[in-house]
Protein backbone atom coordinates (compact mmCIF):
# COMPACT_ATOMS: atom_id res chain seq x y z
CA UNK A 1 0.00 0.00 0.00
CA UNK A 2 1.21 3.49 -0.87
CA UNK A 3 0.19 6.32 1.44
CA UNK A 4 1.33 9.67 2.76
CA UNK A 5 4.11 9.43 5.30
CA UNK A 6 3.60 10.23 8.97
CA UNK A 7 6.05 11.11 11.71
CA UNK A 8 6.17 7.59 13.13
CA UNK A 9 7.45 6.24 9.78
CA UNK A 10 10.79 7.96 10.26
CA UNK A 11 12.24 5.24 12.49
CA UNK A 12 11.48 2.47 9.99
CA UNK A 13 12.66 4.45 6.97
CA UNK A 14 15.96 5.56 8.47
CA UNK A 15 16.83 1.98 9.41
CA UNK A 16 17.39 1.18 5.72
CA UNK A 17 18.63 4.62 4.63
CA UNK A 18 22.05 4.55 6.30
CA UNK A 19 24.47 3.26 3.66
CA UNK A 20 22.82 4.22 0.39
CA UNK A 21 26.00 5.93 -0.80
CA UNK A 22 29.66 5.41 0.06
CA UNK A 23 29.39 8.32 2.51
CA UNK A 24 26.01 7.34 3.97
CA UNK A 25 22.72 9.08 3.15
CA UNK A 26 20.99 12.44 3.54
CA UNK A 27 17.43 11.26 4.20
CA UNK A 28 17.82 11.70 7.97
CA UNK A 29 18.68 15.37 7.37
CA UNK A 30 15.70 16.16 5.12
CA UNK A 31 12.96 13.90 6.47
CA UNK A 32 11.39 16.51 8.74
CA UNK A 33 11.54 19.14 5.98
CA UNK A 34 9.94 16.84 3.43
CA UNK A 35 7.26 15.72 5.86
CA UNK A 36 6.29 19.35 6.49
CA UNK A 37 6.36 20.14 2.76
CA UNK A 38 3.88 17.34 2.06
CA UNK A 39 3.73 14.70 -0.67
CA UNK A 40 6.17 12.40 1.13
CA UNK A 41 5.02 8.91 0.17
CA UNK A 42 5.79 5.54 1.73
CA UNK A 43 5.03 2.04 0.57
CA UNK A 44 4.40 -0.45 3.33
CA UNK A 45 4.06 -4.15 4.05
CA UNK A 46 3.26 -4.16 7.78
CA UNK A 47 6.01 -1.50 8.16
CA UNK A 48 7.26 1.10 5.66
CA UNK A 49 9.71 -0.48 3.19
CA UNK A 50 10.04 2.31 0.63
CA UNK A 51 9.83 6.08 0.34
CA UNK A 52 9.96 8.93 -2.14
CA UNK A 53 9.18 12.63 -2.12
CA UNK A 54 7.33 14.61 -4.79
CA UNK A 55 7.37 18.35 -5.38
CA UNK A 56 4.54 19.59 -7.58
CA UNK A 57 4.81 22.91 -9.37
CA UNK A 58 2.99 24.62 -12.21
CA UNK A 59 4.53 22.70 -15.10
CA UNK A 60 6.41 19.77 -13.58
CA UNK A 61 6.66 17.27 -10.77
CA UNK A 62 10.07 16.66 -9.22
CA UNK A 63 10.66 13.17 -7.80
CA UNK A 64 13.43 12.74 -5.23
CA UNK A 65 14.68 10.51 -2.44
CA UNK A 66 13.55 7.14 -3.79
CA UNK A 67 14.66 4.50 -1.30
CA UNK A 68 13.68 0.83 -1.02
CA UNK A 69 14.57 -1.55 1.81
CA UNK A 70 17.17 -3.92 0.34
CA UNK A 71 15.22 -6.91 1.73
CA UNK A 72 12.43 -6.07 -0.73
CA UNK A 73 14.40 -5.30 -3.90
CA UNK A 74 13.28 -6.57 -7.33
CA UNK A 75 9.59 -6.25 -6.47
CA UNK A 76 9.05 -3.12 -8.62
CA UNK A 77 8.36 -1.06 -5.50
CA UNK A 78 10.33 1.96 -6.75
CA UNK A 79 8.42 1.79 -10.04
CA UNK A 80 5.15 1.67 -8.10
CA UNK A 81 6.08 4.78 -6.13
CA UNK A 82 7.04 6.66 -9.29
CA UNK A 83 3.84 5.60 -11.05
CA UNK A 84 1.82 6.82 -8.06
CA UNK A 85 3.48 10.24 -8.22
CA UNK A 86 2.87 10.39 -11.98
CA UNK A 87 -0.83 9.64 -11.49
CA UNK A 88 -1.09 12.47 -8.95
CA UNK A 89 0.67 14.79 -11.40
CA UNK A 90 -1.71 13.85 -14.21
CA UNK A 91 -4.67 14.60 -11.92
CA UNK A 92 -3.16 18.05 -11.40
CA UNK A 93 -2.69 18.42 -15.19
CA UNK A 94 1.08 18.64 -14.81
CA UNK A 95 2.74 17.65 -18.11
CA UNK A 96 6.32 16.77 -17.12
CA UNK A 97 8.01 14.53 -14.56
CA UNK A 98 11.69 14.97 -13.69
CA UNK A 99 14.17 13.10 -11.53
CA UNK A 100 17.93 12.98 -11.06
CA UNK A 101 19.93 9.73 -11.33
CA UNK A 102 23.65 9.10 -10.87
CA UNK A 103 25.19 8.43 -14.29
CA UNK A 104 26.77 5.24 -12.91
CA UNK A 105 23.57 3.88 -11.33
CA UNK A 106 22.70 1.51 -14.15
CA UNK A 107 19.80 -0.30 -12.40
CA UNK A 108 17.99 2.96 -11.62
CA UNK A 109 18.62 4.30 -15.13
CA UNK A 110 17.18 1.14 -16.68
CA UNK A 111 14.16 1.30 -14.38
CA UNK A 112 13.52 4.92 -15.33
CA UNK A 113 13.91 4.19 -19.03
CA UNK A 114 11.50 1.25 -18.74
CA UNK A 115 8.99 3.69 -17.24
CA UNK A 116 9.37 6.01 -20.24
CA UNK A 117 11.97 8.45 -18.92
CA UNK A 118 14.68 9.78 -21.21
CA UNK A 119 17.97 11.50 -20.49
CA UNK A 120 17.25 15.20 -20.90
CA UNK A 121 20.58 16.63 -19.74
CA UNK A 122 23.71 15.61 -17.84
CA UNK A 123 24.92 17.69 -14.89
CA UNK A 124 28.08 17.63 -12.81
CA UNK A 125 28.33 18.32 -9.09
CA UNK A 126 31.44 20.05 -7.78
CA UNK A 127 32.32 21.05 -4.23
CA UNK A 128 34.36 24.18 -3.59
CA UNK A 129 36.01 25.00 -0.28
CA UNK A 130 35.45 28.58 0.95
CA UNK A 131 38.69 30.52 1.04
CA UNK A 132 39.74 34.17 1.02
CA UNK A 133 40.35 34.95 -2.65
CA UNK A 134 39.92 38.62 -3.60
CA UNK A 135 41.24 38.23 -7.17
CA UNK A 136 38.03 38.44 -9.18
CA UNK A 137 35.96 40.90 -11.15
CA UNK A 138 32.24 40.18 -11.38
CA UNK A 139 28.97 42.09 -11.64
CA UNK A 140 25.46 41.46 -10.38
CA UNK A 141 23.29 41.55 -13.48
CA UNK A 142 19.84 40.62 -14.68
CA UNK A 143 19.40 37.89 -17.27
CA UNK A 144 16.74 37.24 -19.89
CA UNK A 145 15.27 33.95 -21.06
CA UNK A 146 17.78 32.02 -23.13
CA UNK A 147 17.65 28.51 -24.58
CA UNK A 148 21.11 27.84 -23.15
CA UNK A 149 19.84 28.60 -19.63
CA UNK A 150 17.25 25.87 -19.26
CA UNK A 151 17.14 25.19 -15.51
CA UNK A 152 18.59 26.35 -12.25
CA UNK A 153 19.04 24.32 -9.09
CA UNK A 154 17.07 25.26 -5.98
CA UNK A 155 17.86 23.01 -3.04
CA UNK A 156 18.77 20.17 -5.41
CA UNK A 157 15.60 20.56 -7.44
CA UNK A 158 15.89 21.52 -11.09
CA UNK A 159 13.58 24.46 -11.80
CA UNK A 160 12.82 25.61 -15.37
CA UNK A 161 14.13 29.10 -16.10
CA UNK A 162 10.92 30.51 -17.52
CA UNK A 163 10.12 34.22 -17.59
CA UNK A 164 8.42 34.22 -14.17
CA UNK A 165 11.32 32.41 -12.50
CA UNK A 166 13.91 34.64 -14.15
CA UNK A 167 11.98 37.74 -13.10
CA UNK A 168 11.92 36.49 -9.49
CA UNK A 169 15.65 35.72 -9.52
CA UNK A 170 16.45 39.10 -11.04
CA UNK A 171 14.47 40.88 -8.33
CA UNK A 172 16.44 39.05 -5.61
CA UNK A 173 19.78 40.14 -7.08
CA UNK A 174 21.24 36.65 -6.88
CA UNK A 175 22.71 36.40 -10.39
CA UNK A 176 26.37 37.19 -11.01
CA UNK A 177 28.27 37.34 -14.27
CA UNK A 178 31.90 37.41 -15.31
CA UNK A 179 32.55 39.42 -18.47
CA UNK A 180 36.28 40.04 -18.42
CA UNK A 181 36.31 38.75 -22.00
CA UNK A 182 33.88 37.32 -24.55
CA UNK A 183 31.71 34.31 -23.68
CA UNK A 184 30.56 35.32 -20.17
CA UNK A 185 30.05 32.94 -17.25
CA UNK A 186 26.85 33.18 -15.21
CA UNK A 187 26.12 31.91 -11.70
CA UNK A 188 22.80 31.78 -9.86
CA UNK A 189 23.21 31.73 -6.07
CA UNK A 190 20.82 30.32 -3.51
CA UNK A 191 20.88 29.13 0.09
CA UNK A 192 19.97 25.51 0.69
CA UNK A 193 16.52 25.19 2.26
CA UNK A 194 17.51 21.97 4.01
CA UNK A 195 21.15 22.35 5.09
CA UNK A 196 22.59 25.21 7.11
CA UNK A 197 25.48 27.31 5.82
CA UNK A 198 25.28 25.68 2.39
CA UNK A 199 25.34 27.72 -0.81
CA UNK A 200 23.98 26.06 -3.95
CA UNK A 201 25.27 27.53 -7.20
CA UNK A 202 24.01 26.89 -10.72
CA UNK A 203 26.94 27.70 -12.97
CA UNK A 204 26.75 28.30 -16.70
CA UNK A 205 30.39 28.25 -17.70
CA UNK A 206 31.79 30.60 -20.32
CA UNK A 207 35.36 31.06 -21.47
CA UNK A 208 38.01 29.51 -19.24
CA UNK A 209 39.05 32.90 -17.83
CA UNK A 210 35.46 33.98 -17.15
CA UNK A 211 34.68 30.65 -15.51
CA UNK A 212 37.76 30.71 -13.28
CA UNK A 213 37.03 34.33 -12.41
CA UNK A 214 33.53 33.50 -11.23
CA UNK A 215 34.82 30.49 -9.25
CA UNK A 216 37.26 32.83 -7.49
CA UNK A 217 34.32 35.07 -6.61
CA UNK A 218 32.31 32.11 -5.29
CA UNK A 219 35.21 30.94 -3.14
CA UNK A 220 35.68 34.38 -1.61
CA UNK A 221 31.91 34.93 -1.27
CA UNK A 222 31.67 31.68 0.67
CA UNK A 223 34.54 32.75 2.91
CA UNK A 224 33.08 36.21 3.60
CA UNK A 225 29.56 34.90 4.26
CA UNK A 226 30.89 32.05 6.43
CA UNK A 227 29.40 29.22 4.40
CA UNK A 228 30.61 25.74 5.30
CA UNK A 229 29.76 24.17 1.96
CA UNK A 230 29.73 25.50 -1.60
CA UNK A 231 27.93 23.17 -3.99
CA UNK A 232 28.22 23.90 -7.71
CA UNK A 233 25.96 22.29 -10.32
CA UNK A 234 26.89 22.74 -13.97
CA UNK A 235 26.49 21.05 -17.34
CA UNK A 236 30.10 21.80 -18.25
CA UNK A 237 33.42 20.31 -17.19
CA UNK A 238 35.07 23.00 -15.09
CA UNK A 239 38.77 23.90 -15.33
CA UNK A 240 41.14 22.75 -12.61
CA UNK A 241 41.03 25.09 -9.64
CA UNK A 242 42.38 24.91 -6.12
CA UNK A 243 39.85 23.42 -3.68
CA UNK A 244 37.43 22.56 -6.51
CA UNK A 245 36.51 18.87 -6.62
CA UNK A 246 34.22 16.98 -8.98
CA UNK A 247 32.04 14.72 -6.84
CA UNK A 248 29.52 13.01 -9.09
CA UNK A 249 27.61 13.37 -12.35
CA UNK A 250 23.86 12.99 -12.83
CA UNK A 251 21.43 12.48 -15.66
CA UNK A 252 18.37 14.72 -15.51
CA UNK A 253 15.63 12.29 -16.52
CA UNK A 254 12.40 13.56 -18.06
CA UNK A 255 9.08 11.99 -18.97
CA UNK A 256 6.20 13.67 -20.78
CA UNK A 257 3.00 12.77 -18.97
CA UNK A 258 0.61 14.12 -21.58
Predicted regions: what is each one?
Residues 47-55, 62, 182-193:
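Conserved beta-strand in the GNAT
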Residues 82, 88-104, 111, 223-235:
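Conserved GNAT acetyl-CoA-binding A-motif
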Residues 60-70, 194-208:
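Conserved acetyl-CoA binding element of GNAT-fold acetyltransferases
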Residues 15-27, 149-160:
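Helix-loop element at the rim of GNAT/NAT acetyltransferase active sites that forms part
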Residues 68, 74-88, 110, 114, ...:
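Conserved acetyl-CoA-binding loop-helix of GNAT-fold acetyltransferases
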Residues 38-42, 51, 172-179:
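Short hydrophobic/aromatic beta-strand element in the GNAT-like acyltransferase core
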Residues 79, 103-121, 235-248:
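Conserved active-site alpha-helix within GNAT-family acetyltransferase domains
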Amino acid sequence: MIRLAKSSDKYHILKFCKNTFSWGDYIQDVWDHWLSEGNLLVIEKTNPIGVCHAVFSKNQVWIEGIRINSDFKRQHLASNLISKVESLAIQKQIPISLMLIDTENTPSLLMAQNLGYKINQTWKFYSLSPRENPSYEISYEKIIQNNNLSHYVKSWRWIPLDNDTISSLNSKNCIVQSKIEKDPAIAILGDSEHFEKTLIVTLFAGSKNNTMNIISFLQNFGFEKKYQRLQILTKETLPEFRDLEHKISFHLMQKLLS
